[in-house]
Amino acid sequence: SEDQQWANYRINETPSKGVMMWGKMTNQYNQLSMGYNSDSNIERMGYDAHGFTGKRVMGYAESHDEERLMYKNLTYGQSSNPSHNIKNLKVALSRMSAVGAVSLLVPGPKMIWQLGDLGWEKSIFTCANGTVNTDNDATNGDCKLSTKPQPQWVDNWLGDDNRNKIYNDWAKMIELKTTEPI
């Protein structure tokens, strides 16, 4: 494919000249984090699933253009099991450590979007007044580019055991990935 040609271009030169490709996996990772089996195959997070010789896929579960995993966990997450209701903040946050385990440890570079490692749960369509307004809502426009509330600083998210656990779990996985051959 054309992507393979770009990624593998002059791969044996030092430095190699190949192009890094984006590996959007938002829907698949969100299905996993929400507790659903459908459309949850994360195989394409790795470069080898694309047929690339080098680690040329910048895989990610979240970005500036995609809805936050935590927002969808709390809004649409599996809630049929009362002892593991993903719409519960503590349960939803616990699932983010698992997202790190099955994304960060895949060989190749990864992108972590702002505060995903602390379980940011506000929609990307959150307005300055705290409401959520997407381009699909009855009111014209959306708030995707609005200034977002910043509770992580005033509420000391690193002092919150549930959020700090995600941060520390992800840090351990990144350290493992960078110090051990995976």
Where are these regions (language model features)?
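Gly/Pro-rich active-site loop or hairpin
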Residues: 76
